[in-house]
Regions:
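Charge-rich, low-complexity N-terminal segments
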Residues: 2-127
Length: 127
């Protein structure tokens, strides 16, 4: 059996937030041109090798603490007014989350954001 320190693992933490937005590029009269809201689901994935002593890549409490600040900046907000997002598309929100999380989560591997009720999502891997 391989040693745990030789294994690379992907671990993740999910969170949700509620927010409103409109898409400035949507044609007049299109539903996305008007303010509307969504329930968003986010999965933050980290890649790394487990510590041989603890067996952990990262403690989930530490990951949750890093995520809390980013979530707070989005939950029950009007996304068009958040500095750094630009047009509030799934793509731009994923990039915004990445830039907020990376300083606290250097092993960040992936940000997956979706609107489950719309069956739409975006995965950003920092490239």
């Amino acid at each position: 059996m391989p040693h745990i320190e030789d294994m690379t693992m992907l671990i993740y933490k999910d969170f949700t937030f509620e927010a409103a937005h409109f898409l400035p590029s949507a044609p007049p009269g299109h539903p996305n041109s008007r303010i509307h809201g969504h329930s968003f689901h986010v999965r933050v994935t980290i890649e790394g090798k487990p510590d041989p002593k603890t067996g952990l890549v990262v403690h989930f409490d530490d990951l949750a603490a890093a995520i809390a600040d980013a979530r707070e900046g989005l939950d029950h907000q009007f996304l068009n007014e958040i500095d750094g997002i630009g047009a509030p598309t799934l793509e731009n929100i994923a990039i915004w989350l990445w830039s907020r999380l990376l300083p606290q989560v250097p092993a960040l591997s992936e940000v997956h954001i979706s609107r489950p009720s719309c069956h739409e999502g975006c995965i950003y891997r920092g490239k």
